[in-house]
């Protein structure tokens, strides 16, 4: 129930993210990092280089531009799609401040986060809090990720004011390998539809229902165990042939289905569950042949086909 509720809350924002075509990239006047180095490019991209331990923080200063939505795009380091996935990349906490002309800072309150997809162990909404969640790809980054941060009210700037962006990283994988954001863009939109999204009664209702269900879940005592669950259609991952069985050497992209050699009638099979039903069907001779070969091996010491895995 919780995953479906979370996706229902995110869906209007996901659709608006796809529909919003006009975004204005930030123009940086200063970029700092507690570790390593940040480099900006005319395209608006920011690249991180060097050594980045956990808890690395980025502090960026940009020229002011009014906005109703603040988009962060995490981009894989590699240009070769077949080489993905790569090391995880997670924005743990994002905070924004106005820098007044006299140097004083005013916090910009962020109300919600909508993402291109909601899947995995981290909730993107956690990136505007102080928890251990965040937005990005964890423990691996499988492709470009996008999230839109919505302020509590449209943000406007006076003359000579600037925008300060703080990006905090806390996530790490086994061995203490930090999952910092290493290549990204930040841009803004002044589309009022983003503000209207938060004022929609359905949004508030769905958030309240989700929070109530989450509180009930957290009150259940017991041991957490992993559960396999099919990813939503917007969060599916690319599947490729491993050439020679080597995962580092990838071939063509593959679509869900049954190998033609085993599916003479070319029945449409789109999911693993359907394939399991197909394999175990009483009408499928493959299952009987495998079983007969296993029984032969157990009873006579050798199967009809000696290598049982073939």
Across the structure, where does each feature detected by a protein language model lie?
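Short, functional "switch" segments adjacent to catalytic/cofactor/reactive centers
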Residues: 1-44, 49, 115-116, 120-130, ...
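Extracellular polysaccharide-targeting segments
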Residues: 187-212
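Extended extracellular/luminal ectodomain segments enriched in beta-structured repeat modules
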Residues: 55, 64-71, 157-164
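Extended low-complexity, serine/threonine- and proline-enriched intrinsically disordered segments
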Residues: 87-119, 126, 184-188
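Short beta-strand-plus-loop segments that form exposed binding edges in beta-rich domains
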Residues: 74-78, 166-178
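Short coil-to-beta strand junction motifs in C2/discoidin
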Residues: 65-67, 78-93, 176-184
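Short, surface-exposed tryptophan/glycine-enriched loops
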Residues: 59-62, 121-160
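Extracellular beta-rich ligand/substrate-recognition surface
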Residues: 46-55, 135-145, 264-269
